[in-house]
């Protein structure tokens, strides 16, 4: 099953990884670490809450005005 991952640099270093389909969030020192941790956290989540029960969210984008 292919799922989404959103990785954001953490202010204190490393990366925060988020899976929008399940809401699982974790972190890691490198992109690879963060993705591996997210994979493990998401697998554990899906054992209890399969996507067939939870459903998939609608991912879209929106715009906000830029401020100087």
Mark where each language-model region is:
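Short, charged, surface-exposed hinge/linker loops at domain edges
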Residues: 1-4, 32, 36-68
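Short aromatic-glycine-(Arg/Gly/Cys) micro-motifs in beta-strand/loop hairpins
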Residues: 4-21
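A ubiquitous, low-specificity "background" feature that marks scattered single residues
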Residues: 8, 25-27, 39, 43
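Short acidic, gly/pro-rich beta-turn/loop elements at beta-sheet edges
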Residues: 15, 27, 36
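A short, exposed loop/beta-hairpin motif centered on an aromatic-Gly-Thr core
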Residues: 22-32
